[in-house]
Amino acid sequence: TLFNIKNIVIQTVPVALGALGVIFVVSIGSTDISVGANAALSATIAALISQSTSEFLMIPLTLVISTLIGAFLGWIITKFKTDSFMTTLASLIGLRGLMNFILSLKTVTAPRYLLTISSFKVSLIILVIFVVIVFFVFEKTKFGYYCKSMGENERTVKAIGINTNKIRFICFCISGFMAGVFGFILLGKVSGASSTLCNMMEMKIQMAIFLGGILVTGGFSSKLFKAIIGSFTIVIIENGLVSCGVATSPSE
């Protein structure tokens, strides 16, 4: 029905937005499983600060905080040559713990205007805008080409004089930024922060990317349309399980 289609699109928007950022990280052969925790913590801190200042600072603050978290992870991985999976896994646990600590001290509510932004029409417009931007950057620029080339053979890319550390750092910054985008949208949907905000989003995003046909090693298998198709696929599967009477916990 039309209602079901609309519901699927609404649920797909945050997954697809997250995938638009994570695809950069995956294309270079790395991974970022901290985006859900990053989104939740960034939106929570930004909403908390905006409660005592201006509610219109909430969105810019969310994007700044989430990008800084992504930049910090990118710096650790490039500086200390740590494994991206283990680094982002540790940050996932740490960020969730910090968020739970904040929520134990304060009640965090979302600004009212976020209800409008998280609505069907506005959130879909936001997705379309970012799809166009990311398509251009990822598919039509040298930066996107270098990202995919790193996934194929990083040594070769480094040998021709490309700063692979800089590219990796920027990819994690982009992933962090996009985490902030779907973070404030999901916060607006539930009207306030809770310990379950953006729960399992990192897994949904990873599954969306790989279900779409992008290889774990990244490279030139990384295509934007695959991430979008994968995002719809994972949401349709989840809704299908619920429609079949499967409880929420097993379906997740």
Please place each PLM-identified region on the residue numbering.
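Interfacial loop-to-helix junctions that mark the boundaries of transmembrane helices
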Residues: 2-10, 53-60, 113-124, 193-200, ...
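Hydrophobic core segments of alpha-helical transmembrane domains in multi-pass membrane transport
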Residues: 21-23, 96-97, 126-137, 175-182, ...
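Transmembrane alpha-helical segments in multi-pass inner-membrane proteins
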Residues: 194-252
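Transmembrane helix-bundle core of multi-pass membrane transporters
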Residues: 80-141, 170, 189-195, 250
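Helix-loop-helix "hairpin" substructures at the membrane interface of multi-pass membrane proteins
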Residues: 52-56, 60, 69-73, 119-194
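Single transmembrane alpha-helix segments in multi-pass membrane proteins
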Residues: 1-52, 77, 81, 209-221, ...
